[in-house]
Curated annotation (Swiss-Prot):
Interacts with MEIG1. Interacts with TP53, MDM2 and SIRT1; the interactions mediate post-transcriptional modifications of TP53 by MDM2 and SIRT1. Its main location: cytoplasm. It is found in: Cytoplasmic vesicle, Secretory vesicle, Acrosome. This is MORN repeat-containing protein 3. It comes from Macaca fascicularis.
Length: 240
């Protein structure tokens, strides 16, 4: 008795095209309609693995790790230099979900760069910033600004050690006037010293010492006086 066989279902034409168009593994240049192109690894039709993306509009180049279509892992971002026309590195470090996250180095100019921690493409955590004028800040960051404990070392050697908030000196801190041989210790509000004490500090080694030394002041409880002055200042601020 003859046995009938069911004919195999043929794959529809559009499904075949779609299957063949799915990008997996290493591919050469794949162009987007806007002129951007990518060279590297794919998975399930998205960038995944090692690859290089070039953006036509601004000439930016990213080389590094990708995960499910986004920059994720370690990578380097470069931009064309407006003066030379050549690409220069602007960021090298870690990424997560298409944003700078983890440890990385950002170059703002030939003599200005940041090295430290990032979160959501903003400086956040511990980091060190080298400014073009020669100043150096080292300490905590939040929302792309110094925030927390940190030290600012000026080009002339003077330095501030203490609390920061919103990118400004706020709270208790010490300012070493090493050029004049003096030390100020007190309380700051938005970069302004509001109350504190000034003493001689390394005056004999200072390149430009003050004409006269600060006389020794005999106070029974200098810390208590400073604490009282600070409390009065805070009370005044709250009243405003």
């Amino acid at each position: 008795m003859p046995v009938s066989k069911c004919p195999k279902k043929s794959e529809s034409l559009w499904k075949g095209w779609d299957r063949k168009a799915q990008k997996n593994g290493l591919r050469r240049q794949v162009y987007a309609v806007n002129g951007d192109y990518y060279v590297g690894e794919w998975k399930d039709n998205v960038k995944h693995g090692k690859g290089t993306q070039v953006w036509k509009k601004n000439g930016a180049i990213y080389e590094g790790d990708w995960k499910f279509g986004k920059r994720d892992g370690y990578g380097t971002l470069s931009l064309p230099d407006q003066q030379t026309g050549k690409c220069r590195r602007v960021y090298s470090g870690w990424w997560k979900g298409d944003k700078k996250s983890g440890y990385g180095i950002q170059f703002f100019g030939p003599k200005e760069y940041y090295e430290g921690e990032w979160c959501g493409s903003q400086r956040s955590g511990w980091g060190r910033m080298y400014y073009s004028n020669g100043d150096i800040y080292e300490g905590q960051w939040e929302n792309d600004k110094p925030n927390g404990d940190g030290m600012l070392r000026l080009k002339n050697g003077n330095r501030y050690e203490g609390c920061w908030e919103r990118g400004m000196k706020n709270g208790l801190g010490r300012f070493f006037h090493l050029d004049h041989g003096q030390l100020f210790e007190g309380f700051w509000v938005d970069n302004m010293a509001k109350c504190g004490t000034m003493i001689d500090f390394g005056r004999d080694e200072a390149p430009e010492p003050t004409q006269f030394p600060i006389p020794e002041v005999k106070i029974l409880d200098p810390d208590g006086v400073l604490a009282q002055a600070l409390a009065m200042f805070k009370k005044t601020e709250e009243g405003d």
